[in-house]
């Protein structure tokens, strides 16, 4: 079984004492972010690790805190933000994009270490959050774009929500 260790203030945290509901809520919300922008969740998680918000030392995910990982993910996330605005970009609900969002949501939750010995619950919550974020995000964006008469301002607003939401969630874990 994968053992993910979390650190807070350079001391090993006993994350088994954290309320399971809180862990599942964070996992779900990270999934929602991945549903909005597939690469935003892992990118912000990598930056959180790199900035020392939590430590991945001694885990299978320690590579996520390296500068090269952060820069590559940032470059790819920026590309996703640009590509999302192009008229020929397929809907996020087509199978390849949908599956990617579920996988990146679950992966991001795994990196954060949803809970020791409760990783499966966190992964499931993250995957469900990604489904909700994908379908809900597409629905809300479509409705708001229809009301506004333009998609671009709503797409940019969605970018801001994804970036700030990910920063908020990851900084709290």
Model feature map: region roles:
Residues 14-25, 48-68, 108-123, 168-173:
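Helix-coil boundary and interhelical linker segments in multi-pass alpha-helical membrane proteins
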Residues 142-158:
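Interfacial loop-to-transmembrane junctions
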Residues 46-47, 51-55, 64-83, 96-101:
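Alpha-helical transmembrane segments and their juxtamembrane interface "caps"
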Residues 78-91, 135-147:
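C-terminal ends of transmembrane helices
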Residues 156-172:
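Final/C-terminal transmembrane alpha-helix of multipass membrane proteins
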Residues 92-103, 125, 151-156:
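Cytoplasmic-side transmembrane-helix entry/capping segments in multi-pass membrane proteins
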Residues 80, 100-109, 158-163:
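Core segments of transmembrane alpha-helices
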Residues 106-114, 126-139:
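Mid-bilayer segments of alpha-helical transmembrane spans in multi-pass integral membrane proteins
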């Amino acid at each position: 079984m994968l053992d993910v260790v979390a650190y807070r203030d350079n001391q090993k945290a006993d994350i088994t004492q954290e309320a399971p509901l809180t862990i599942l809520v964070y996992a779900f919300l990270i999934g929602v972010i991945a549903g909005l922008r597939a690469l935003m969740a892992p990118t912000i998680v990598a930056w959180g690790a790199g900035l020392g918000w939590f430590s991945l030392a001694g885990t299978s995910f320690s590579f996520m805190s390296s500068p090269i990982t952060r820069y590559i993910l940032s470059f790819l996330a920026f590309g996703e933000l640009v590509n999302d605005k192009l008229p020929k970009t397929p809907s996020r609900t087509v199978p390849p994009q949908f599956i990617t969002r579920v996988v990146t949501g679950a992966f991001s939750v795994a990196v954060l270490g949803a809970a020791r010995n409760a990783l499966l619950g966190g992964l499931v919550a993250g995957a469900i959050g990604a489904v909700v974020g994908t379908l809900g995000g597409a629905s809300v964006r479509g409705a708001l774009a229809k009301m506004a008469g333009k998609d671009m301002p709503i797409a940019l607003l969605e970018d801001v929500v994804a970036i700030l939401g990910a920063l908020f969630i990851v900084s709290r874990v």
